Amino acid sequence: MPDETEADMTGITPRRRPKPNVEEIGGRKLKPSTLMMGHGFDPSLSEGSLKQPIFATSTFVFPNAAAGKRHFEGITGKREGGAEGLVYSRFNGPNQEILEDRLGVWEDAEEALAFSSGMSAIATLFLAFCSPGDTIIHSGPLYAATETLIARILGKFGVKFLDFPADASPEEIEAVMRKAGDGRVAMIY
């Protein structure tokens, strides 16, 4: 039944969503600095705490086994539609969700992602946009771990790279792009 809800399938009403964010008052759009004070946080979801508490946990409870199974099927792609809710802080957590919501507001972006390190952000970028046979064109030198990721790790999967000096002119960068030939340039980094 395609119209079944989460509650129909698991017998449990899904986690309540936070209250809608206030983005204007009296027809006047609030500035990001004002929105950052409370955006993405609903005190009723946190025992009435006025400010967002720090959630020092790595795992979250499911109401029953069926809800847990359905959630993991959504995360792993075994079921279409993804998964909502919290399960394990390596996927998401209340603090991370609020931070990402607020970064999106601050940057006027549709969404934002927070990572535990710069290298995890860089690796995610490359893995999301590069396929075997692609070329990454980048300025050089790079941080050693980034160069290692590009040359040694992505190189094993058929991703190539070309670099240009950090002070290169637009013409020099275009020359490096021509060197890439007919291959697909996945990104200029």
Where are these regions (language model features)?
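Conserved N-terminal alpha-helix of the aminotransferase class I/II PLP-enzyme fold
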Residues: 4, 59, 64-120, 145, ...
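Short helix-loop-beta connector
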Residues: 106-110, 130-133, 182
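Conserved PLP-anchoring active-site segment centered on the Schiff-base-forming lysine
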Residues: 128-146, 165
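A glycine-rich helix N-cap at a beta->alpha junction
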Residues: 153-168
